[in-house]
Amino acid sequence: MIGKSYIFHLFLFLLILPDSIYSQDNICLIPQVESMVRKKGTLSIERLESIHFPDEWKNTGNLFVSDLKELANLSVMVTASNPSIHVKKVKMQEPEMYMLEITKQGIIIEAGDQTGMIRAFSTLLQLILGSEGKELPRLIIHDKPR
């Protein structure tokens, strides 16, 4: 069921989203996130070279790596050593919650369960596709199903 939900959201994203999902001051994500705080500056897409995720989420993490390659033409290696995208399993208040932070150095995703990680991946993929392969805005997103 997790895979179908992810595919549905991706399909909806590709159908509805305009050419660019964010402008200088506006970021549009589907579904709309619960909380987003913009920060000054950006992260170059070129810095996204590696990813690390918990071993128990390996299959889903590897699917995301494939999606990045196929949909965004972005090659990312799976590594435990200093990843530019770091996914952490943490205790969250509710199921499916996640936090996604884009810093100058990379991306941090915190999720309490695999579904939260999938939701974070969906949000990150929208941001990457909307960036037109250049820069991601620095921000912190907190989200959960509503």
Predicted regions and their residues:
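Bacterial N-terminal signal peptides that target proteins for export
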Residues: 1-9, 20
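Acidic, contiguous N-terminal accessory segments
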Residues: 12-13, 20-145
